[in-house]
C-alpha cells in the first residue's frame, strides 16, 4: 500500500507522522498516526506506537492499535509492527521516505 505523509509534528525525543492512503484493500481509505520515540542507547532507531482508522467503500469502519520498531537510514525510516485491528492481527513492514513524503508498506494477516 502507498501512503502519503500529511504532516509531521517534531518533538525533542519523539515525532509524530500522520499518513493517509486512498486504498488499503478491505480497509478502504486509511489514516494512521505513528509516534516514533528514539532509543538513546541505539543510534538511529527506536520504538513507535500509533493508531489507525479505515473506512471501506461500504461504510465499514476499522480501527487499529499499532506498535513496532523503527530504524533510520538517511532520509528513510524502516518500520515493522504487529497491529491489533478490528478484524484480527496484522504484521506491517514498510519504508517511510521523508524526502519523497510517502510510505510504501506491505500488510499481512497473522494467522
Question: Model-derived features: where do they sit?
Answer:
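Beta-strand-enriched cores of mature, soluble protein domains
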Residues: 1-111
